[in-house]
């Protein structure tokens, strides 16, 4: 982290940090990054997303697990920006999801605001814990706590280390 650490991440920076790509890249922008502490991700929900074909035909509802994944991706971007991990083959793995509650349906046309706050973890730590809240127009859609392991490989995936 430096004085030049960005407080936002556009889709280009997000893709330099996260390995996820369509159809599993679930955050479009991250703003209000407070290094190693918190951030707000934005996910523009569109009818073109593949999960809406089967969840549910005629009544498209974003699966709750994808909302939680979007919060986790927001947290990973916050840590990645804070630790200057763009282009460094940064991987993150779920370790646990706790106290998850869904409060509102999310569907096409909604903009998810993904508020994440680190409750455990510090620069260089492998295990982090976060509190997350997903909102649409200020209304709570989902809340949970989750634990993730941050992994910075010494060589790119698929290459011998």
Curated annotation (Swiss-Prot):
GO terms for biological process: fatty acid biosynthetic process; lipid A biosynthetic process. Its EC number is 4.2.1.59. It catalyses: a (3R)-hydroxyacyl-[ACP] = a (2E)-enoyl-[ACP] + H2O. Keywords: Cytoplasm, Lipid A biosynthesis, Lipid biosynthesis, Lipid metabolism, Lyase. One of its GO terms (cellular component) is membrane. It is an enzyme of class 4 (lyase). Pfam families: FabA (PF07977). It comes from the Bacteria. One of its GO terms (molecular function) is (3R)-hydroxyacyl-[acyl-carrier-protein] dehydratase activity. InterPro entries: FabA_FabZ, FabZ, HotDog_dom_sf. Belongs to the thioester dehydratase family. FabZ subfamily. Involved in unsaturated fatty acids biosynthesis. Catalyzes the dehydration of short chain beta-hydroxyacyl-ACPs and long chain saturated and unsaturated beta-hydroxyacyl-ACPs. NCBIfam families: fabZ, PRK00006.1. This is 3-hydroxyacyl-[acyl-carrier-protein] dehydratase FabZ. It comes from Jannaschia sp. (strain CCS1). The lineage of its organism: Bacteria, Pseudomonadati, Pseudomonadota, Alphaproteobacteria, Rhodobacterales.
């Amino acid at each position: 982290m430096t004085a030049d650490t960005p407080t936002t991440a556009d889709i280009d920076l997000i893709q330099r940090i996260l390995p996820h790509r369509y159809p599993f890249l679930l955050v479009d922008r991250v703003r209000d990054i407070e290094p190693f502490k918190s951030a707000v991700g934005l996910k523009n929900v569109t009818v073109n997303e593949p999960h809406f074909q089967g969840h549910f035909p005629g009544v498209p509802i974003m699966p709750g697990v994808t909302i939680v994944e979007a919060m986790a991706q927001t947290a990973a971007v916050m840590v990645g920006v804070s630790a200057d991990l763009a282009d460094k083959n940064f991987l993150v793995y779920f370790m646990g999801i706790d106290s998850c509650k869904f409060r509102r349906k999310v569907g096409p046309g909604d903009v998810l605001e993904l508020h994440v706050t680190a409750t455990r973890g510090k620069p260089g730590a492998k295990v982090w814990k976060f509190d997350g809240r997903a909102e649409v127009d200020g209304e709570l859609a989902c809340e949970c706590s989750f634990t993730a392991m941050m992994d910075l490989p010494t060589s790119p995936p698929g290459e011998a280390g």
